């Protein structure tokens, strides 16, 4: 995302921004829109030198815990070529529900994925705990 896009997020009532930091260093972030009972992960990233160390999973679990009881499902779009992210999302319980042809500006397709939560705010068949994202 561009700096301008991030700055615009701060003016949206339905936009939530999260930062994952370790020892004062920002190593990841997420932007989530909550509209009614649905949380859409608009953007999520972990610094490349931290890939494969569980930070993405920790951040995703934190998001699910944070929105428990507030939403009935999560939705996200992911590049078809981003196998690492797709596997992460599937390991947490996300399912591919559709393919969006030419979704990205470079023409790449996207998968739309969802995680359905139970009415009590829990997810179906998985147990998550909150994680400390810094400080």
Language-model features and meaning:
Residues 1-51, 60-67, 98, 116-121, ...:
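Acetyl-CoA-dependent GNAT
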Residues 67-77:
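Conserved GNAT acetyl-CoA-binding A-motif
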Residues 75-77, 90, 95-111, 133:
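Conserved catalytic-core motifs of GNAT/GCN5-like acyltransferases
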Residues 37, 48, 76-86, 102-107:
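Conserved beta-strand-loop-alpha-helix junction that forms the acyl-donor binding cleft
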Residues 43-61, 79-87, 91-92:
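Conserved glycine-rich acetyl-CoA-binding loop
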Residues 84, 121-122:
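Residue-level signal for secondary-structure boundary sites
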